[in-house]
């Protein structure tokens, strides 16, 4: 399941992030690459653990914690601290699959990457190219979203970023370990939760059908989740 989530960050929050990022020091993006990715990756990245990366990462994590759609879709158990990249001057990232396990350097923290996320921090009209292209059994999906919007997709997906030929594409990217490992079960729970909310708006939270379906949702979550 691929999902676009609007307004994870407000325009004011995006501007605040960009103000800090635009004066920060950037390094070669291969600092966080695995072997396969290092052969495919051409971009710049904020150093992992830098004060700017930590400050903006905390802001993003707070925003995710307040976003009901993100929680319903991802059912997050762990979120890898957000990283930040920049593409310009023809830079791109060829087809690859993200590493299954991500380690936070210098700590014992690790995340199984069930879901990948890209949070756009540049308006689409400010650069050419730079589309995130995600492949699944239905074909290719080309993603280029407004600043503050996020795309969430299975970390098992082949994906690439097309060359940026004008301007610069700045974004945050990170991985989520879900309480529900199985993608199909997770998608079913998200669909069920969404439908329950729709019925509740029409019938009210105290409607017996809403109460019953909510019980079904939680019992399925109890059966499938690791917490």
Curated annotation (Swiss-Prot):
Residues 78-178 form the Fe2OG dioxygenase domain. One of its GO terms (molecular function) is 2-oxoglutarate-dependent dioxygenase activity. Fe cation binds at residues 96, 98, 159. It comes from the Bacteria. The keyword Metal-binding applies. Binds 1 Fe(2+) ion per subunit. InterPro entries: Oxoglu/Fe-dep_dioxygenase_dom, PKHD_C, PKHD_hydroxylase, Pro_4_hyd_alph, Pro_4_hyd_alph_FE2OG_OXY. Keywords: Dioxygenase, Iron, Metal-binding, Oxidoreductase, Vitamin C. GO terms for biological process: DNA damage response; intracellular iron ion homeostasis. Its cofactor is Fe(2+); L-ascorbate. Its EC number is 1.14.11.-. It is an enzyme of class 1 (oxidoreductase). Pfam families: 2OG-FeII_Oxy_3, PKHD_C. The keyword Oxidoreductase applies. 2-oxoglutarate binds at residue 169. This is PKHD-type hydroxylase Reut_B4660. It comes from Cupriavidus pinatubonensis (strain JMP 134 / LMG 1197).
């Amino acid at each position: 399941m691929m999902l676009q989530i609007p307004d994870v960050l407000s325009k004011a929050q995006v501007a605040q992030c960009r103000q800090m990022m635009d004066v920060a020091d950037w390094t070669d993006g291969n600092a966080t690459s695995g072997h396969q990715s290092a052969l495919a990756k051409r971009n710049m990245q904020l150093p992992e653990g830098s004060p700017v990366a930590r400050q903006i990462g905390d802001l993003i994590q707070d925003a995710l914690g307040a976003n009901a759609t993100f929680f319903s879709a991802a059912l997050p158990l762990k979120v890898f601290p957000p990283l930040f990249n920049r593409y310009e001057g023809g830079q791109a990232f060829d087809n690859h699959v993200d590493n299954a396990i991500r380690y936070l350097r210098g700590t014992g923290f690790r995340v199984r990457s069930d879901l990948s996320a890209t949070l756009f921090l540049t308006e689409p009209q400010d650069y050419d190219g730079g589309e995130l292209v995600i492949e699944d059994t239905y074909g290719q999906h080309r993603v280029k979203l407004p600043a503050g919007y996020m795309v969430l997709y299975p970390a098992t997906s082949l994906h690439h970023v097309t060359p940026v030929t004008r301007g610069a594409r700045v974004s945050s990217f990170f991985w989520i370990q879900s309480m529900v490992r199985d993608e199909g079960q997770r998608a079913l729970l998200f669909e069920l939760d969404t439908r329950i909310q729709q019925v509740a708006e029409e019938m009210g939270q105290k409607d017996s059908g809403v109460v019953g379906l909510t019980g079904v949702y939680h019992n399925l979550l109890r059966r499938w989740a690791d917490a």
